[in-house]
Structure formats: structure tokens, C-alpha cells
Amino acid sequence: MNQVRRWQRILILSLLLLSVLAPIVFVSNRLKSITSVDRGEFIEELSDITDKTEDELRLTAIEQDEEGLKEPKRILQDRDFNSVVLSNSSDKSNDTVQSNEGDQKNFLSEVDKGNNHKPKEEQAVSQKTTVSSNAEVKISARDIQLNHKTEFRPPSSKSEKNTRVQLERATDERVKEIRDKIIQAKAYLNLALPGNNSQIVKELRVRTKELERATGDTTKDKYLPKSSPNRLKAMEVALYKVSRAFHNCPAIATKLQAMTYKTEEQARAQKKQAAYLMQLAARTTPKGLHCLSMRLTTEYFTLDHEKRQLLQQSYNDPDLYHYVVFSDNVLASSVVVNSTISSSKEPDKIVFHVVTDSLNYPAISMWFLLNPSGRASIQILNIDEMNVLPLYHAELLMKQNSSDPRIISALNHARFYLPDIFPGLNKIVLFDHDVVVQRDLTRLWSLDMTGKVVGAVETCLEGDPSYRSMDSFINFSDAWVSQKFDPKACTWAFGMNLFDLEEWRRQELTSVYLKYFDLGVKGHLWKAGGLPVGWLTFFGQTFPLEKRWNVGGLGHESGLRASDIEQAAVIHYDGIMKPWLDIGIDKYKRYWNIHVPYHHPHLQRCNIHD
């Protein structure tokens, strides 16, 4: 019994040993039987697998390193990956890739030399192995670039790039072509067709309406309906038929000239109408501002008399910084005051004088009562209650050759009475109400004006956004004007001006202003407004300030650079496109809007928004 069991164990162990040794012997014999050609076929299959999976490996590597990629680098590579040219900001990475490519080329040359002494079958195997090694070297080069945060892009031919650029640029060519055909068709319809061609005219009208419905207000080709190409072809056929119906070319040329003249006249009329509407919008008070003024005026008269006055301050202290603005606009005067105070390094030394008329005095007073300025002092003055203007001044203003209420306003010319309005002051800075202060103006008070009366930024350089010449405002054909003044003299701008009131009083320039103003009204020697008569009154009395103190041109399309605006101490919205009007220029409005409290309840109720 024990003998039987022993034989069973021996048999089982023998079978186990045979099952282990048999595969080893079989595989070794199989490997020995593989010929060189079979080995070449095997390597070729392996190389094909490597080539097929190369792009997949590259994409997988990019996905794994995607979070580290911040900016794509430019790459130019061949389709068969025989060469790789990489644009990288790192010289070190470039040297690494180039050295790898050089080693690779040397390796390939050595292999080629060795293959010359081998049989053809072995050379085939070597070539396949070389291609596989080439692919491996390229993959290693890509790994290096991926480590340097370089993104690989699939190669694109030159024709593909040109096509892509053309598609990006020509996004409205089809729309323009359709509109040209419509214009051409309408021109033919306006011409008298010879003979009996009613069918052609009918077809042309139908095609025109079809294209007009297809295009509508479309400006891009991608928004055109799919039927537009067919309709365009039908229009071209109709235009060809119509063109063959005309034989009298001189008559057609005459008709087209008449149509051109009519179109030009219509364009000129449209321009005149647009200019008139712009001027009308500039002179009209916006509904929101009118609502705000009415609400503030009503609230002002509901207050007790003793509560209507601002706290009395040192309004006549000559050691403080005095600023003045003449305005009938609540928001405009508020922006001037707020921007000046917020930009100042010493707001407690600022005294702001806001001069207005009787109509707007309650509203402006109520606004500053509701919105105190903090440490700065504010004084609201009514020009109609001050006995500084001559009794006949209003009559002189009405004689100006202008219907613009802004020009004939008493506030516009009250600036020429500054020494009389502020008899206790020696210096003062005058603002127009369409300015915004962006820098501290303390340095102005320490300027030595060398005996001049007014400090201003000059505007006599051609190409300057605020360029003006004397002869464009003043009639130098008059003998008296040409003898006393120089037409080539440098002009200067209002907006922000520093006045030496002591020197003004000494030279009695207010009397000079009244004399010149009366002469100008009687003889029509210059354009209406305060600027021409101001140039003549202060002729030879101007101290030039640096340009950065006052940058103008924000009230019209002047092409100002953003850097010039942001570096300016004061920006001036000279022109009709004021920032509080709907016609204001959006890119310039933002400098004004930041000083307007649009969250204020009164502005919300009057629908005044940013």
C-alpha cells in the first residue's frame, strides 16, 4: 500500500516538472527558428505601432502637463517628424534640443555606413530600427519641451494658414456684394427702359425685394440665410438681362450724373440736419437735470430762512486757496467742487466760490446743504444780487450776433469782473463748469507770474486738440484790429486759469474789457462769446502754464491719448458734447462720472444714471 502511494507521488511530481520544463524548451526552439527576415517583419510591425501611437502619446503628455502650461510657444515641425524647430525663450532648452538632434544625425550616419557592408535583408532591419530610434529621439525632444511648458500644435500648411486669415478678414464680403447688387438694381430701375421691357423690370423688382428681405440689417456673412447664394445668382441673371436692354450709353451717363448730384444733395442736407440737432441737444437742458433742479428748489423753499445758509467760513482770507466757478448746472458745479477737494492734499485750506444766477441759486444752495464738502469751505453767490455788473451790461450781451443762450448769458461774461466780485482777494483760480480736477493744484499758488495777469495753457500749436488761431475768431481785416493786435499771436484756453487780481486792478483791465466788448458788438469785429474778447483784453498779459495743467478736447472728437488725459491736472470738456448730455463721448464720460453720486435719492428719482 505504501509502495503504491510512493509511485503516485513520483508520477505527480514528474508531471509537474514536465509542465514547467516543456514550455521553456518549446519557446527556446521557436526563437531559434526565427529568421532574419521574420525578425525584420516583427520590428516593422513594432515600428508601425510606435508611429501610430506617437500622436496619442504626445496628446497624453500634453493633457498631463496641461495645468502647468501658461502660454503656448511657437512650433514648426514636419509631417514625418524628421525635424523639429522650436521657438522658446530659454536658450538652454534650445541647445538641449539641438544637441539631441545632432547626436541623432551622427547616430543615423553611423548606422548608414554600417549598413553598406550588410546583406539587404539586414539593411532592411537596420533601417526599420533606425526609424524607430528616430521616433524615440523625437518623443524625448518633445518631453524636454513639455518640461519647459511648451505646447505642441499640429502642423499646418501655408495654404491652410492663408485660407484661415482670409476667412477671418472676409466676414462681410458676401453682404457687401449683395448690397452692391441692390444698389445697382435700384439704379437700373430709376432709368427709363427703352421699348417694352415690363417683364424685365418686374423680375428685377422681385429680385431686389428678395435680397433686401434676405439681408435686412445683417452685417456678417454668417448671419445670412442659406438661400442667399441662390438669390444672389438670380439677381445677377436679372441684372445681365437689364444691361442688355440698354443701348444708348450717353443717355444713361447723363441720367447717372443727375442721380449722383441728387444723392450728394441729400447727403449734404442730412449733415446739416445732424449738425443742427447736435447744437439743439447741446443747448437743451436734459429732462433729468431739470427734474433735479425742480426738486431741489422745492425742497429749498420748504426750509426755514435761517437753515438756508451754509455755515459762515473765512471766505475772504487771502492766505487760503480760493477757487471760483460760474455755473447754472447743479451736477456740473458739484463735480468741479468734489473733484478739486478730493484731489487736494490740503482740503482744509480750500475755499470754493460757486457763482450762479437767481433762477438756479436755490437748487445749487440746496444741493450743497444736503451734500457738505467736509473740511473745505463753500460759498454760494447770486450774481444778480451783486452790484458789480453795469446796468447796461445785459443790453450789450443781447446785441451779440448769437442766439445761443450759453453765449449771451451773464454768467459767461461775469469772469471779467473778478476783482470787483472778490475785492479782498489777491489771487484766484477760475474754473469752467465743464472741467474735472485730477491732481493737487497747490503748486499753482507758488508760481511767479512775472507781472502777468492770467496764467493759462497755450493753444497755438497746430495739431493740438484745442488748437485755435486768432484770425479764426477775430476780423483782422479791420484797420484798428490789425494795427493793435498780431494775428499770429499765441492763443490760450479757458477752463482753468490763475488770475493775479492785484495786477488786474492796477492795469484796470475790466475797463479795457468793456471798451473792447462795446467795439466788437458795434463793428462785428469778432465772434460772439467770451474767448475772443478775453484774448484781446489780456493781450500781452498771459503767463504760459505747462500743458499738463489743463488738457482740453474732451467735448469733441479730438483723438486725445488716454495717457495725456490721465496725467493732466485738469481735463476740460470744451465743445458741445458735454459729459452730462446724451451726446457726450462715452470714452471721456467716465472721468466725469466717478465724481457724480448716482446713488443719491434725488438722482434716482429723476432717473439720472451712469
Swiss-Prot record:
Positions annotated as glycosylated: N88, N94, N196, N338, N401, N475
Matching InterPro entries: GAUT, Glyco_trans_8, Nucleotide-diphossugar_trans
Cytoplasmic side: 1-6
UniProt KW keywords: Cell wall biogenesis/degradation, Glycoprotein, Glycosyltransferase, Golgi apparatus, Membrane, Signal-anchor, Transferase, Transmembrane, Transmembrane helix
Regions of compositional bias (Polar residues) in chain numbering: 86-101, 124-135
Residues spanning the membrane: 7-27
Loss of function: phenotype: No changes in the cell wall content.
Pathway: Glycan metabolism; pectin biosynthesis
GO terms for biological process, alphabetical: cell wall organization; pectin biosynthetic process
RNA-binding is among the record's keywords: no
Protein name stated in the entry: Probable galacturonosyltransferase 5
Lineage: Eukaryota, Viridiplantae, Streptophyta, Embryophyta, Tracheophyta
Gene (UniProt): GAUT5
